[in-house]
Amino acid sequence: MIRLVAGNPLTRDAVMEEISAVADAGLEFHVVPGMSLPSTVPSFAGIALGSTYTEADLTNGPVDWDQLASAPQPLVFQATQEHLAEMAEALMERGFQGATPVTITTNGTTRLQRTFDATLQTVGNLDADLSGALVVTLGTVADDRSKYSWWENRPLYGWRVLVPRAKEQAGPMNARLTQYGAIPQSVPTISLEPPRNPAQMDRAI
């Protein structure tokens, strides 16, 4: 049996309970740690977190804003759009400036990733499609991401490109388009197949 978990499995309470049950039963198991979204997505957004930062999941129950407000920055949150206004209000009440840079990344690490820039003052009213899970990076490092952006600034990033080639010939073109950030979609226009009746081919020759 394989259990797939987003990020590091040993940070999930439900997974730990399952591992404990397996261990108590005397069964063998292996854990393959992955990188958590808060540590991975900012890199894909061009944000250099540095060696010290604080991450928190705003979707996982009550949030201790007092502790987060005094934690080492930058702050990296897992959140949804519904959490943004509450986050901004809570942190500004605890001394954060409204001009503090904030980035919001949706569909992180995929070819549909989009990163939006805001401030703590404006993030709650951001006019953007922020559906699904978000990774929010807050702090001065968010203001420098243009220096290190490498994923979303590729020349064809986000373009859907039709590749009208025979299925067997589309591979190299699809690979090149992907390198430039495009999303290739093969449209087979030619199919090379053996003759259904070899006798007809022999007569034609």
Per-region residue spans from a language model:
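Short phosphate-binding/catalytic loops that engage adenosine nucleotides
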Residues: 27, 96, 181-183
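Short gly/pro/ser/thr-enriched loop/turn and capping motifs at secondary-structure boundaries
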Residues: 36-40, 56, 84-85, 109-112, ...
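Short, acidic/small-residue loops that bind anionic groups at enzyme active sites
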Residues: 19-42, 50-59
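Class I S-adenosyl-L-methionine
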Residues: 1-32, 134, 189, 194-196, ...
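A contiguous loop/helix-start segment that scaffolds small-molecule binding in enzyme catalytic cores
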Residues: 1-6, 13-20, 60-167, 172-175
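Short, hinge-like loop/turn segments at secondary-structure boundaries
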Residues: 21, 45-51, 121-122, 202-204
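A cross-family signal for N-terminal binding/gating loops and helix N-caps
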Residues: 163-205
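Short, charged, surface-exposed secondary-structure boundary motifs
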Residues: 39-42, 61-63, 112-116, 194-199
